Amino acid sequence: MKEIVIKTDKLTKRFGDFIATNEITFEVVAGEIFGFLGANGAGKTTAMRMLCGLSKPSSGQASIAGFDIYNQTEQIKKHIGYMSQKFSLYEDLTIKESIQFFGGIYGLTDKQLKEKSESLIEQLGLKDQTKKMVGDLPLGWKQKLAFSVAILHHPKIVFLDEPTGGVD
């Protein structure tokens, strides 16, 4: 039997009288690629934010990696990577500081962080750029860095919000 890693049942998010997501129900099994398609304002980002534990649903149920989105959000965050459409990077940090910051959030040990930082910097071809401010990077580099820090801790599930916007 295939492992269900995301399961929703009538997941709804309201902002006052406005319904951003209306009773969405689906399942995603391990290894499956799943995507939301829709016009701007259709609720794709809202749905992802609920699934990542960043926004509380108005009603419905969901579990991510076996954890309930209402009362196990911290456990969910340890098992997912999330790259928002704004890249979730701090413009006033250097490349190296960004990697260390996100590694710390994901609970990597100092040893893991050192190894992963060096490996990531090498893979991205940024060895001579580690002191460069994120705000000074071209959009494509920001996107590569944002994706890289989202998967730094080898999450079970990765959420990508508009992952191809601005790719060179």
Which residues make up each language-model segment?
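Catalytic Walker B motif of ABC-type/P-loop ATPase nucleotide-binding domains
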Residues: 158-161, 167
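Conserved ABC ATPase signature
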Residues: 133-140
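Conserved ABC ATPase "signature" region
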Residues: 100, 104, 111-129
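Hydrophobic anchor residue at the start of the ABC signature
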Residues: 147
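Conserved ABC transporter NBD signature motif
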Residues: 60-68, 75-76
